[in-house]
């Protein structure tokens, strides 16, 4: 569904929070322009917003809205036609010997926050003073516009949490919010 089709009817206009700009996390030296909506107003059409390229952060939904760039792409994996490659099967078979997974409600813990901080410091070179505290972790990953439909996909090995995915369960899709 195209953004123009979703925006008709006034609901999205009521949810409109504005545009923001930041350094593009995907293309060095570029600026990203984002369109923000209040997720509380659009929860019941969130699946359609995903189809239009929106993502979620806490209680807000957003999408890249750059005027001169269209490089950000939504990745969809149609599960009914997806077939693992030989390499994917090999990695899967090795992984199930080492890791266990659990799906649980999204909740805060110091262990999860520390795992996210480790990821951000390593993967994004985020300085210590910018790393999330409990409040920012909760706002971004736990307190959402989707309530109990936001879940955690936990990855464990030897009794230690080593990976965490925050996912939104929708009627026809799972949407990954963040994985670290």
Walk through the language-model features, giving the residues of each.
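A conserved beta-strand-loop-helix scaffold within acyl/acetyltransferase catalytic domains
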Residues: 57-68, 74-180
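Terminal substrate-recognition subdomain of acyl/acetyltransferases
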Residues: 1-107
């Amino acid at each position: 569904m195209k953004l123009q089709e979703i925006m008709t009817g006034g609901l999205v206009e009521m949810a409109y929070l504005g545009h923001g700009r930041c350094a593009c996390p995907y293309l060095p030296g570029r600026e990203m322009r984002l369109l923000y909506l209040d997720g509380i107003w659009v929860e019941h059409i969130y699946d359609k917003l995903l189809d239009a390229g929106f993502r979620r952060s806490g209680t807000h939904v957003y999408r890249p809205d750059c005027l001169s760039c269209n490089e950000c792409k939504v990745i969809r994996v149609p599960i009914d036609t997806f077939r693992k490659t030989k390499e994917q099967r090999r990695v899967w078979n090795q992984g199930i010997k080492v890791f266990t997974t659990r799906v649980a409600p999204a909740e805060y813990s110091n262990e999860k926050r520390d795992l996210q901080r480790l990821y951000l410091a390593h993967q994004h070179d985020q300085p210590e003073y910018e790393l999330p505290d409990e409040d920012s972790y909760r706002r971004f990953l736990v307190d959402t516009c989707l309530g109990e439909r936001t879940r955690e996909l936990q990855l464990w090995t030897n009794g230690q949490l080593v990976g965490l995915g925050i996912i939104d369960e929708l009627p026809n899709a799972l949407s990954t919010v963040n994985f670290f």
